[in-house]
Regions:
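C-terminal and inter-domain tail/linker signature
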Residues: 2-24, 68, 75, 82-86, ...
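Short, surface-exposed "cap/lid" segments of acyl-processing enzymes
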Residues: 23-74
Length: 257
């Protein structure tokens, strides 16, 4: 590499992403701003199961929590837990609308990691389908018929186990079965049934499904990589190198967007 690449953001060397802590919106609803150097991104609502650890943290052994992982992807995240009230989806939407870092605000996504929460939230999601333009739901294969009848939002279904009949996708939906696992909590970090490789596959599928419908966020990954490798291997500036990386890289090189 002969010369410094174009700076990914601004006209100066990279600076670390400012630490962000989840902010409580109301009981059971938290807001986490984008953990990206860009600093803003579209809204993502997460329906998450309870964290049963005695001392919950956002990252453990290099594995981020659900909300942290999506914030590192550049989204502004509103997370809903089971102890939230019946108005949680609207409260989460309001928090995103009021957040300066949530931009644009007209196309938001939703991911459900807890089917009990989906049952409580489906009608609210449907009432906001002009704003919630895409969704993904993790469930058991046997639950597909029930949950798919509750929404008209374009949805990707991640199904644990093998269904007895062939699942058919539509113009507005995609269906993936994960026959090697029986638990729909396989994507939930810190759970006994968490399976890293399977979660990674489903996460990549979510990104491919969500980004065209939410108009991003898109990043110049080649430029980000060139900037990162320049500071590590040519400039050899530790501070600037670390500023191009996520908080706790889980492989040798994980540039932050």
């Amino acid at each position: 590499m002969a010369a410094i690449p174009e700076f990914a953001y601004g006209s100066s060397p990279p600076v670390p992403v400012a630490p962000q802590k989840p902010e409580q919106v109301t009981e059971g609803v938290t807001l986490l701003r984008p953990l990206s150097r860009r600093g803003h991104g579209p809204g993502m609502i997460i329906l998450a199961p309870n964290d049963e650890r005695a001392a919950p943290v956002e990252i453990q052994d290099g594995i981020p929590s659900l909300r942290m992982k999506w914030a590192e992807e550049g989204y502004c995240v509103a997370e809903i837990r089971p102890n939230a009230s019946s108005g949680a989806v609207k409260a989460a939407m309001q928090a995103l609308e009021n957040c300066a870092e949530c931009e644009p605000k007209d196309k938001m996504g939703l991911i459900c990691y807890d089917t009990d929460l989906w049952s409580k939230s489906a009608s609210a999601v449907e009432s906001l389908k002009d704003r919630i333009v895409v969704a993904a739901i993790y469930a058991k294969a046997s639950q597909l018929k029930q949950i798919s009848s509750q929404t008209s939002v374009p949805t990707m279904y991640h199904l644990a186990g093998k269904s007895e009949t062939k699942s058919t996708a539509t113009a507005n939906s995609k269906i993936y079965e994960y026959a090697t696992t029986e638990s729909s909590s396989f994507p939930v970090p810190f759970y006994e049934d968490f399976h890293y490789a399977t979660e990674a596959v489903s996460h990549s599928r979510n990104l491919a499904f969500f980004k065209p419908r939410m108009n991003g966020p898109y990043f110049d990954l080649e430029l980000l990589w060139d900037e990162h490798t320049y500071y590590e291997f040519e400039n050899r500036n530790v501070e600037h190198t670390m500023a191009t990386m996520v908080e706790e890289p889980y492989v040798n090189h994980v540039p932050t967007v």
